[in-house]
Amino acid sequence: MRDGMGRLCIAKFPKPSDTDDVSAWEYVALQIARLAGICVPDFRLVRFGGRSILLLDRFDRSQAGRVPYISGLTAVQGRDGGSYSYLELVEFIEEHGSSPMYDLHELWKQMLLTCALGNTDNHLRNYGFLHDGKGRRLSPAFDVNPTQGDFDKSLSTAIDFDVRDADPRAAFGVREYFRLSAEEARHIASQTANVVARWKGLARKAGIDSRSVKEMSSCFECGKRRLREIAR
């Protein structure tokens, strides 16, 4: 669809069964990602009939037309329902990426935030690669959704081949595969923690009600705490 400015975008509507303002929380998560230095598509939140609708610009389109795109699942030659790891995306970037160092760092930042927010819907269709004429580039982050609670959450895509815990400390443990030193990873974790700490103000500016803010509090506070444990 096109928005009021004529820009090609994707509109994410709430489901009738949604009890929380899912689109608004995704909007908050995307704001956190952008403030943490993660590449995201341009996005905005609109209200219609008392419901939130998230609009995201299409990053697989340019003025010249369609930009070649494949999902992370296609990249690893996988199938729906299979079991996969971020390390398989690392291997794909190493073999096919036109800017592997940058994209490995970017993927690690995405993975770190996914862990901090308990984004358990991190299956490989929610990652993608564009073609820049020289090779593959990691796409901007999308479908970043925080999950309620501070309990242990299991990721759809594993950190490595054994660990599925949505824990930033697990992400820190595999940093070397992403060509990050301990010092670099701690710096990123510190910056990310400082942004996650702003979640409540971002939620209120997005118009999320106080009940939902209270219910999501443990998710963000736990993520912030675990990020700061890395940053020490």
Q: What name fits each language-model region?
A:
Residues M1, A33, G72, D121, ...:
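A residue-level signal for conserved active-site and pocket-lining positions in enzyme catalytic cores
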Residues M1-G81, L138:
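Conserved ATP-binding subdomain of kinase catalytic cores across diverse folds
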Residues D20-R34, S85-D150:
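Conserved kinase catalytic-core segment
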Residues R47-G49, L107, H187-A197, C219:
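Small/polar glycine-rich anion-binding or flexible loop at a beta-alpha turn
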Residues R58, S62, R66-L73, N145-D152, ...:
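C-terminal regulatory or interaction extensions
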Residues Q77-F92, H131-A185:
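Catalytic-core segments of enzymes that bind and process phosphorylated/nucleotide-bearing substrates
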Residues E95, R136-L138, K153, G201-R232:
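Regulatory N- and C-terminal appendages and interdomain linkers associated
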Residues E176-V195, W199-R204:
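C-terminal structured "cap/appendage" subdomains that terminate the fold
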